Amino acid sequence: MTEQQKYWFAARTRDKQEFTVRKSLDRLKSEEHLELDYYLPTRFVISQLKYRRKRSEVPVIRNLVFVHSTKQTACDISNIYNVPLFYMKDLSTHSMLVVPNKQMEDFMFVMDLNPDGVSLDSEILTVGHKVKVIKGELSGIVGEVAIEANKTYVVIRIKDLLTASVKVPKSYLKIIG
């Protein structure tokens, strides 16, 4: 890892503290002028209270935030600025888990497009052919094929962390390897 290059790091938060961490990271960006970005996938849910409905924002993945910064800045966020983040470890290298840029871009694109239509699984799905989506809104996304209940899904994997699957017609896919 080079010192000045930015990486995506996967970090855990305490239970129900995702929005507090987001607020702290926003404050560090604006007041402390730290060179960092973050990604917290959220969606809106309408809950029925006694006599009214309430629209609230909830995280798609509980207790998980992605931080884009240099390794030193990522360490400073929790050690110096006391933001309650716990970086996940890569089990093979025993260092902080780094998510590749392409995987992160694909994941953010799919989550921003339709967070309700995405199913997230932390366990590994059926291993299939590597494919690229060539038509539609998801054009350019690279993933693997999974078939569940006779429907075709493209599975996007973030190594050692999670998988996201999106329903895609078979005619939109091209096998790449």
Where are these regions (language model features)?
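Glycine-centered loop/turn positions within well-structured domains
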Residues: 152
